[in-house]
C-alpha cells in the first residue's frame, strides 16, 4: 500500500475531497453524494416521534410547575430549571440534527475506487473513512418509508471491526 506522503509533512493542508486521499495509481470508479431531500428529510423524521412525545410529556409537567410556581420553595426553582433543561436532551438532539442536516449533507461524499470505498463525512471538519475491498464481510441494502418515497436507499457495508452506512443514494 502506497500512502501519499504529503499528508504527513508538517504544515500540510488537510484533504478537502476524496481525490485528495487517493493513493498512487488509484482510480475512482464512481463517486457521489446522498440525495439532499432524502438526507435532510430522514434527519428530520428520524427522532421526530420521540421528540414530540418527550416535549408533550415535559410540557405537561412544566405547565403544572408554572401553575403552582408560587407554592414552590425558592431553592426548588433552579433545580427544576436545570432538571427540565437536562431532561429535554432528546429534543435538543433532534433540534441539533435538524439544524445541521444541510451542512452535514454538504460535507458527505462517497467514492468507489478500484481498491476501496472512501467515505467523507463531518460537520465542521472532514472525516475520511476507507474500507478496503479485501476487508468487506457483507454488503446490505436497506430502505425505509422516506427512502421508498424519494427513490433512494442506504448501503450498509460491514467490514472487519466496523460498519459504515452510505446513506440516501439514488436507485
Predicted regions, residues:
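Short, non-transmembrane cytosolic segments of multipass membrane proteins
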Residues: 1-26
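Short amphipathic
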Residues: 27-34
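Alpha-helical transmembrane spans
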Residues: 37-106
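Surface loops and adjacent helix of pleckstrin homology
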Residues: 33, 122-124, 141-144, 160
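Conserved beta-hairpin
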Residues: 93-140
